[in-house]
């Protein structure tokens, strides 16, 4: 899957950063074309979430990071699931005031003969002068470390 887009720009002095886009889903594995002994295709890996944009230079909250998904295996015997994408990092708060953005959640890996590994959560964004750091995104349901707290 493709990488998620970075969050949209904010106003130069004031304004909140946009959230990062979610990573594209990994491709689904193809069905086996031969007999039952032919393995099905594996799912593609999910794309990583985009980073949240930073808050305005003076005042503004950082945007949250996006997440991704993993593709599922198919066929007989079934293929393995693709890895889940990592969560994007949260954006930084404004220089005077603003909270850091939350880190994106890592995606659960796709299902199949072997489940795909889950992605890691993104790091929380930092506050600079006044504001709370963003909490790290959680890891995937099966595997994946949570992101660091801002």
Language-model segments: residues:
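Long, compositionally biased tandem-repeat segments
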Residues: 1-150
């Amino acid at each position: 899957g493709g990488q998620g887009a970075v969050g949209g720009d904010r106003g130069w002095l004031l304004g909140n950063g946009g959230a990062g886009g979610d990573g594209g889903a990994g491709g689904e594995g193809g069905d086996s074309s031969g007999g039952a002994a032919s393995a099905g295709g594996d799912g593609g890996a999910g794309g990583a979430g985009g980073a949240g944009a930073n808050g305005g230079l003076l005042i503004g909250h950082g945007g949250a990071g996006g997440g991704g998904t993993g593709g599922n295996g198919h066929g007989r015997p079934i293929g393995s699931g693709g890895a889940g994408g990592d969560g994007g990092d949260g954006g930084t708060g404004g220089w005077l005031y603003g909270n850091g953005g939350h880190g994106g959640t890592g995606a659960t890996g796709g299902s199949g003969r072997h489940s795909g590994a889950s992605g890691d959560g993104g790091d929380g964004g930092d506050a600079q002068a006044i504001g709370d750091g963003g909490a790290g995104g959680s890891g995937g349901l099966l595997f994946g470390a949570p992101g660091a707290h801002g």
